[in-house]
Swiss-Prot record:
<feature type="disulfide bond">
    <location>
        <begin position="69"/>
        <end position="76"/>
    </location>
</feature>
<feature type="disulfide bond">
    <location>
        <begin position="1022"/>
        <end position="1027"/>
    </location>
</feature>
<feature type="binding site">
    <location>
        <position position="531"/>
    </location>
    <ligand>
        <name>Ca(2+) 2</name>
    </ligand>
</feature>
<feature type="glycosylation site" description="N-linked (GlcNAc...) asparagine">
    <location>
        <position position="784"/>
    </location>
</feature>
<feature type="glycosylation site" description="N-linked (GlcNAc...) asparagine">
    <location>
        <position position="696"/>
    </location>
</feature>
<dbReference type="GO" id="GO:0009897">
    <property type="term" value="C:external side of plasma membrane"/>
</dbReference>
<dbReference type="InterPro" id="IPR028994">
    <property type="entry name" value="Integrin_alpha_N"/>
</dbReference>
<feature type="binding site">
    <location>
        <position position="475"/>
    </location>
    <ligand>
        <name>Ca(2+) 1</name>
    </ligand>
</feature>
<feature type="repeat" description="FG-GAP 7">
    <location>
        <begin position="571"/>
        <end position="631"/>
    </location>
</feature>
<keyword id="KW-0106">Calcium</keyword>
<keyword id="KW-1015">Disulfide bond</keyword>
<dbReference type="GO" id="GO:0033627">
    <property type="term" value="P:cell adhesion mediated by integrin"/>
</dbReference>
<keyword id="KW-1133">Transmembrane helix</keyword>
<feature type="disulfide bond">
    <location>
        <begin position="108"/>
        <end position="126"/>
    </location>
</feature>
<dbReference type="InterPro" id="IPR002035">
    <property type="entry name" value="VWF_A"/>
</dbReference>
<keyword id="KW-0325">Glycoprotein</keyword>
<feature type="short sequence motif" description="GFFKR motif">
    <location>
        <begin position="1126"/>
        <end position="1130"/>
    </location>
</feature>
Amino acid sequence: MAGGVVILLCGWVLASCHGSNLDVEEPIVFREDAASFGQTVVQFGGSRLVVGAPLEAVAVNQTGRLYDCAPATGMCQPIVLRSPLEAVNMSLGLSLVTATNNAQLLACGPTAQRACVKNMYAKGSCLLLGSSLQFIQAVPASMPECPRQEMDIAFLIDGSGSINQRDFAQMKDFVKALMGEFASTSTLFSLMQYSNILKTHFTFTEFKNILDPQSLVDPIVQLQGLTYTATGIRTVMEELFHSKNGSRKSAKKILLVITDGQKYRDPLEYSDVIPAADKAGIIRYAIGVGDAFQEPTALKELNTIGSAPPQDHVFKVGNFAALRSIQRQLQEKIFAIEGTQSRSSSSFQHEMSQEGFSSALTSDGPVLGAVGSFSWSGGAFLYPPNTRPTFINMSQENVDMRDSYLGYSTAVAFWKGVHSLILGAPRHQHTGKVVIFTQEARHWRPKSEVRGTQIGSYFGASLCSVDVDRDGSTDLVLIGAPHYYEQTRGGQVSVFPVPGVRGRWQCEATLHGEQGHPWGRFGVALTVLGDVNGDNLADVAIGAPGEEESRGAVYIFHGASRLEIMPSPSQRVTGSQLSLRLQYFGQSLSGGQDLTQDGLVDLAVGAQGHVLLLRSLPLLKVELSIRFAPMEVAKAVYQCWERTPTVLEAGEATVCLTVHKGSPDLLGNVQGSVRYDLALDPGRLISRAIFDETKNCTLTGRKTLGLGDHCETVKLLLPDCVEDAVSPIILRLNFSLVRDSASPRNLHPVLAVGSQDHITASLPFEKNCKQELLCEGDLGISFNFSGLQVLVVGGSPELTVTVTVWNEGEDSYGTLVKFYYPAGLSYRRVTGTQQPHQYPLRLACEAEPAAQEDLRSSSCSINHPIFREGAKTTFMITFDVSYKAFLGDRLLLRAKASSENNKPDTNKTAFQLELPVKYTVYTLISRQEDSTNHVNFSSSHGGRRQEAAHRYRVNNLSPLKLAVRVNFWVPVLLNGVAVWDVTLSSPAQGVSCVSQMKPPQNPDFLTQIQRRSVLDCSIADCLHFRCDIPSLDIQDELDFILRGNLSFGWVSQTLQEKVLLVSEAEITFDTSVYSQLPGQEAFLRAQVETTLEEYVVYEPIFLVAGSSVGGLLLLALITVVLYKLGFFKRQYKEMLDGKAADPVTAGQADFGCETPPYLVS
């Protein structure tokens, strides 16, 4: 357990706190009950916060209020402003922005409304305030007048005979009612009735000149007749919409056609008149009355009469009484046309612009984002002083920008003396877009643009230009996409370098919030914070108000060299850290100014109903140094030859910290509470030195340090004999600043970027050499094969080599033994032997990468780092021997000893030895089951023969092929009498077989065969077959057959009835090269036995003849005996005679005996 503690203590490294630069212990909190207080916030004038509450109901038709919040008091006061009377419900404070010189503030209310007749327009309005928050002017100076668009509306009513008088009267009432809705406007009316006759009832001039215009409708009488609709449309275009009849050139021209059916016998087609009406800009509304328009052809004709698209310009009602039901709908569409300033009835220009949705103050004047301009394509208005405003957009004809909300966010970039305007369009093509505009020849034109990648991400909803190196030129543009969705986090901010800096405008990095907040809305608010970590680079803050179930969070990202933003946040401040009541913390941000007058920048964060001011912490920069005395550990201290542990003093270490401010502030002599940790030999299992004060390898303390130099001296001890005296003792210092309640203004300092929070110093050992820096080692090496005489590849899986290394010179540093061996061997393990009264043997061996295909090497470090003077060690290194290895007939193993002393090689530092090599094989020969096992014979058959076969199979189960010889011995003669006329069938080509006769080993066959009834080559003359197989491949299988006719004349010499006929086979190979697998030698030989058994043959003719004669004689004898006994005498007559003498008996006998039962009826 003690060793484990040492590991934990000596390997411990304290992480220093560089990251937290904002104070979250004592924030300044501003709270108001006003609706949406904290929706926007801006630092202003270096001493105050201006907070927007855009939804607060200030008075009737007046929404939005600004608050002046003083950090010194923690109180907020409403700012009394006089909003323009015509700016109804403007939501003042929905956007706030200050000038770079803090001299002006622009507060906007983009929902400022104005009612024009029946329409309500949202133009927006802003207030420009001075340095004392006094009103300077409204931007724009006044709300625009209601559009005075003139309209000339002509009625073309159907007077054909298909309409009855009552319906015609209802149609006239509809005309009068519609005319009445446009009373007191600049709208003029005219009316023409058509059938096959066309009649103008009143012109625009007549309508204009009469006091009671509706009296013009009452005298109208129905014409009756056919339906010439197309002709009527052309007549209206040519006559009513003519200046002679009072039609105005500046007025929009609207034609209302009321009909109950299709045209009939009209000489004109619609194709003759509709294109001309479109060209003249006449907006046509077609009203179809009755059931006729249920037919597709009639409906198609009605759609042709109306302008495109039909859903906006064609109406159908079931009867004339229902015309009133569409009156309001038609009226609203016509009013909408009156409210627009375009030729199209379905698009707006600036009527719904919502100027001030975003804003910026530039040297050229205020810039107001106008998201609603041109059907929410968007843009921005620049208001130069004493000049008409300039509208900046992608051009109103750019259909690609429809519903893009360009101007949703606004930022200003400055590069090489040129101002650029950056506008966000988060709904562009549903993925978002950001465009940079620059001024060329007094015209603002798009220079670069970048598009979002995810649908619904709202890419471009927030923008922030960043001057990273604070040289006055914009380096980066941060683009927020707060609704960007990933499975575990929501929102992202893309970092784009300004195009003028690095060419193309493309994303350089992407910033994200913490995992686990898919609805976090990271990036909804962005601000430049200033330098809070002392690296002279601008840092940024990013809000994520949706994190932690909408409690919210703010992230701090530091600027980096090369004009970048660090990809990981340095600090994350959550709303729940500050107060459990906070909601949407981070929905608005403002930074860069010192509002608390401590010389340090502050960050203002808006939440729901709250604004919090977070102060940045003072920075300290610390320089570290360590000095040792003496500068190395003396030999007398660390060497102990008898290994008797003695605690000796190694020296002293003086640790110094020099503290000064990391950035200027107004806090005076800042003091910091420092926690420091000293560790000796960190990372080692066992430290070679300890501190005298703690008696272990670590020392921890805490001190309060002010500005200046601070030093402390510690004593170092060596508690044990030092084996590694080559690498120096490492002393590592780690320290961190911890919070101290006594800090000025309750601000505890943190380390500035670039400040040291750790230092490492080395204390070397004095070398044991005659020359001060160079030791003369004298190494020697030898080895043997641990008693092994022959290496059998495949039989010996391992090769163990016993190695002896000695040093007859001075200390040898980094002693290394390198072994070189063939590729069939591989390093497996090493085992050392410990000698008494010696240092523990330390071995570390490893295989090295192969430099040659057929050569391998391994190296062993001996007693690293020092193999001392006079030392000698013996160890055993074991190699695996591959069963597939081919090593030739001898294995050569070489070894070389070397060190870092750089002494030249000698004949003692290299050694080599050879070992004979054999290869394990596994070949076998076996008998086959289909050999002839048993033969019966009879000596009476004389020279009759029988065929017999002995079958053998040769297999090679070795991992290599080899040349073998197969020998067969077959008995063929016994005492000169033929036994077996045998031949050998060889298996394949390439196998050559020869034969020769071999005399018996023991000619006294009779004695031998009586002892054991076996006929083999020991008593018989044998035929010896010798078959050479030059290459028996791996897994080869060869069959040999000994086949021939057996003779049995020799059997009588054996005096045996049963004899075993035995053939033998044997495999041989070059035993100087190969060795049969141990324990498998029996499979190199085999034999086949055939049992020969004699039987006696009997003649069947004599047996049959004798049996027949004997049977006849026996039959005759039996017959004579029966005759003598009277067996053949008849007694029937005597029986009849006996029955006649007894009538009764005779009658009964007659009936019972003479009459068979089956004849009775």
